Amino acid sequence: MKIFDLHCDTASKIYKKQCDFSDKDLQVNSRYLSEFDEYFQVFAMWTDANEHRDNRKYISDMIDYFSTQIKKHPDLRYIISIEGGETLEDDVENVNYFFSKGVKIITPVWNYKNLIGVPSCVSDFGGISLFGRKVIERMNALDMAVDLSHINLQGFFECAERTAYGIA
């Protein structure tokens, strides 16, 4: 069977537990993935923006830890994503920084309004900010995908007009 999964939180769980990707308690682990003929996974790096003072550092450290774990499984095909633009703080250069660390997809908003835009669980209105537009422009320049799964309706259409690679 061939599987392409666009989202799982395993990377965040591995980092919080400081465990190996083969840990049997993980919902998605190396043993589970080895049961499929072909498997491609998008691993979301996520944190609750209210839990950490420095989301950029936290996600950066998570990517580093996860990368050491995933390298033990060279047959696995995967993409690293970031869920929640809070990690970018207020600096569009952080898009470049995370791209250099292997991130190929960013979800601009999760469940909180941030400097980029407004999630659907907060309001259907509000769209994306000027900073959000700059983030999408930079992502386009780097051929990164914009995950629109949590953004509100207005933001969805504003992003869809601007992004070269939108997914929802």
Where is each model-derived feature located?
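N-terminal hydrophobic targeting/anchoring segments and the immediately downstream early-domain regions
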Residues: 1-125, 130
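Histidine/acidic residue-rich metal-binding segments in metalloenzymes
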Residues: 92-100, 122-168
